[in-house]
Amino acid sequence: MNETEKSTHFGYQTVPTDQKTDKVKHVFESVAAKYDLMNDLMSLGIHRWWKDFAITQCRLRTGQRILDLAGGTGDLAKRISPLVGDEGEVVIADINAAMLNVGRRRLLDQGIFRNIQFIQADAEKLPFPNNFFDRIVIGFGLRNVTNQLAALQSMHRVIKPGGFVVILEFSKPTLAPLKAVYDAYSFQLLPRLGKLVAKDEESYRYLVESIRMHPDQEALLSKMTDAGFEDCDYHNLSGGIVAVHRGYKF
């Protein structure tokens, strides 16, 4: 669907474009407290390996300024923080205050605060100067953005020349047998887990549907190119259930 149209998708529903942001906001307000626990249950803990792999693709160095976009609960930021050191900076930006509050408490409890900032921000209109960050990483957040092209263009604007973006996101399984098992697991088990653990079946049904509506590997690659990124590539993880995309700004 063209992102400039007056309607867009919210999971499998078609909704007015100006309503999607609020609907997604309500989902993440509902799931914030149990979000990381549910990630463990939904992925059988494999999300930790996916995130570790994404961070290795960032090639981080001491002193760099990193944007962890849609970084809410701080699960990527806690991996990034020691790699850039006290001379560096990690900015966690998320549109959802509830997710940021969870992340702030969690990182403080773990003693991770010296090089961390939390900012509530819209990915489509990032409130940072041009050429500001050495790297941008966004984990499992892009599919929830209403206008993904606008968000990618905003990322391109604020990243420094020579820097790059790393996008960790659910994608499309590349093996037919895996797809059948994955569909059954996603649509039958995950909403039930959401109901049991987070007391919210509908929000987790949306999260499953949002994965299916997200562009596949090649379509996202094309969208990154349209936003101005160059030398874009991707790695499939777990048979394409997840992909890590990377694009440079020169």
Curated annotation (Swiss-Prot):
Q: What is its EC number?
A: 2.1.1.163, 2.1.1.201
InterPro entries linked: SAM-dependent_MTases_sf, UbiE/COQ5_MeTrFase, UbiE/COQ5_MeTrFase_CS
GO terms assigned for molecular function? 2-methoxy-6-polyprenyl-1,4-benzoquinol methyltransferase activity; demethylmenaquinone methyltransferase activity
Q: In which pathway does it act?
A: Quinol/quinone metabolism; menaquinone biosynthesis; menaquinol from 1,4-dihydroxy-2-naphthoate: step 2/2; Cofactor biosynthesis; ubiquinone biosynthesis
**Binding-site residues, S-adenosyl-L-methionine:** T73, D94, D122, A123
Q: Which SUPFAM superfamilies match?
A: S-adenosyl-L-methionine-dependent methyltransferases
GO process terms (BP): aerobic respiration; menaquinone biosynthetic process; methylation; ubiquinone biosynthetic process
Keywords attached to this entry: Menaquinone biosynthesis, Methyltransferase, S-adenosyl-L-methionine, Transferase, Ubiquinone biosynthesis
Against Pfam families, the record matches this protein to: Ubie_methyltran
Q: What reactions does this protein catalyze?
A: a 2-demethylmenaquinol + S-adenosyl-L-methionine = a menaquinol + S-adenosyl-L-homocysteine + H(+); a 2-methoxy-6-(all-trans-polyprenyl)benzene-1,4-diol + S-adenosyl-L-methionine = a 5-methoxy-2-methyl-3-(all-trans-polyprenyl)benzene-1,4-diol + S-adenosyl-L-homocysteine + H(+)
Which CDD domains does the UniProt record give? Answer: AdoMet_MTases (cd02440)
- Transmembrane parts of this sequence: none
Which leading EC class covers this enzyme? transferase
Instruction: List the PANTHER family.
Output: 2-METHOXY-6-POLYPRENYL-1,4-BENZOQUINOL METHYLASE, MITOCHONDRIAL, METHYLTRANSFERASE
HAMAP family, per the entry: MenG_UbiE_methyltr
Q: What does this protein do?
A: Methyltransferase required for the conversion of demethylmenaquinol (DMKH2) to menaquinol (MKH2) and the conversion of 2-polyprenyl-6-methoxy-1,4-benzoquinol (DDMQH2) to 2-polyprenyl-3-methyl-6-methoxy-1,4-benzoquinol (DMQH2).
Family recorded in the similarity comment: Belongs to the class I-like SAM-binding methyltransferase superfamily. MenG/UbiE family.
Protein's name in the database: Ubiquinone/menaquinone biosynthesis C-methyltransferase UbiE
